[in-house]
Amino acid sequence: MAKKTLKVTQYKSASGRLEAHKACVRGLGLRRIGHTVEVEDTPSVRGMINKVNYMVKVEEE
């Protein structure tokens, strides 16, 4: 059975944000506005997304 993945897209800049939020964006693998990555659906990834939900858009697959 394939693992569930999430498509995460950054739509706001991380500059000028809290260091912890910048680290979460980096931890998700996002580098710039408009960048999209596919990440595994795990509790730790969900926590990072939840922390920076005002900067990213999420699509479930």
Swiss-Prot record:
Ribonucleoprotein among keywords: yes
Pfam families: Ribosomal_L30
Gene3D superfamilies on file: Ribosomal protein L30, ferredoxin-like fold domain (3.30.1390.20)
Single Gene Ontology BP annotation: translation
Entry superkingdom: Bacteria
Example of a GO MF term: structural constituent of ribosome
GO CC entries: cytosolic large ribosomal subunit
SUPFAM superfamilies: Ribosomal protein L30p/L7e
Keywords of this entry: Ribonucleoprotein, Ribosomal protein
InterPro entries: Ribo_uL30_ferredoxin-like_sf, Ribosomal_uL30_bac-type, Ribosomal_uL30_ferredoxin-like
Family: Belongs to the universal ribosomal protein uL30 family.
Assembly notes: Part of the 50S ribosomal subunit.
Descriptive protein name: Large ribosomal subunit protein uL30
